[in-house]
Amino acid sequence: MKFSIGVSLLATLAGAVNVDMAKRDTSPLNVKLEALGNSGVKAVLTNTGDSDIKLFKTGTFLDKSPVEKVEVFAAGSKIDFDGVRLQISTTGLTEEAFQIVAAGETFEVEFDAAELHDLSKGGAVDIVTQGSFLYADVDSTEIAGTIPFSSNSVHTEINGDEAASVRAAFLAKRTIVQSDCTGTRRTATVNAISRCRALAAAASQAAASGPVARMTEYFKSSTTATRNSVATVFRNIVSECGSTTSGVSRQYCTDVYGACSNGVIAYTVPAQNYMVNCPYFFNNMAAASSTCHAQDQQTTILHEMTHLRQIKGTSDYGGYGYNFVRSLSAAQNLNHADTYTLFAQSIYAGC
């Protein structure tokens, strides 16, 4: 990992498009996508249940930040997402982070898929969105659980030149030069990176030869293939967290991408190999916590590391925390940032 004082910023569902019909049939949230113009998308969310729902917006298609709102496929292959991957706090949230959708209410948002996906080749694409919303009780800001959702698939034809212009205009707004990571923020970040290395080293050993019960608790498998895959991810993190002057990633201590919205602890832009620690990281988090499944600075660094494509290129699937980890399939756990994070944290905390 390298600290940087300036940079020009850019701001799998392998195979065929896969829409989870079970989620669509059982969720109180109905999500319908519509194509707008060349590469625009309208997401229409309807609460089909009989009670109001208070949805956590951050990191979802309701978020105005450059997060992964949709997945885009061309000829059955997923097009890389070039925006931010977030680490979200599940405590200390404010009302601004939520959207209440009344029973029977419909809520619409619009965005452009070309801003964070390279659609310059043009041609036919399929667009979907699926995952989970965190939610709170209507009179609270404490996360109460998750609600899955899955949209329809929209098939549309893209004009590559128009899409390239949209992308170029969006990225031009994201070009910033920033000097940061000094003083106490640098100290906190350096210490967290060092702790991340120790966490990953212990996790790598546990993945390779540790108890079967821990592997199945977090990854739902303890086969040799699963152990090797997980151990490799942690070994990659050991290497990346082993230096603050070399490696594939760059670390920032100020919000160079403008993505530190409510509840965001840190974020990563995998396409550009940089990570940002938000004010919440410095002002609200302990360096380390021995409470099982707690969030802290050391695990935040590890979480963000897994998002790097050279490490693993994980997703969040819209969910964080132990209960969400337990709800995923084995295949999803292998590509879920918080699964790796909580596996490593459980060893540190002796869970």
Curated annotation (Swiss-Prot):
Name assigned to this protein: Neutral protease 2 homolog MGG_10927
Cofactor binding: number and manner: Binds 1 zinc ion per subunit.
Propeptide regions on this chain: 17-177
Protein family according to the UniProt entry: Belongs to the peptidase M35 family.
Catalytic activity: Preferential cleavage of bonds with hydrophobic residues in P1'. Also 3-Asn-|-Gln-4 and 8-Gly-|-Ser-9 bonds in insulin B chain
EC number, as in UniProt: 3.4.24.39
Cystine crosslinks: 181-253, 260-278
Any one cellular-component term (Gene Ontology): extracellular region
InterPro entries: Fungal_M35_metalloproteases (IPR050414), Lys_MEP (IPR029463), MetalloPept_cat_dom_sf (IPR024079), Peptidase_M35 (IPR001384)
Transport among keywords: no
Gene3D superfamilies: 2.60.40.2970, Collagenase (Catalytic Domain)
The protein's role, per its UniProt record: Secreted metalloproteinase that allows assimilation of proteinaceous substrates. Shows high activities on basic nuclear substrates such as histone and protamine.
Stored Pfam families: Peptidase_M35
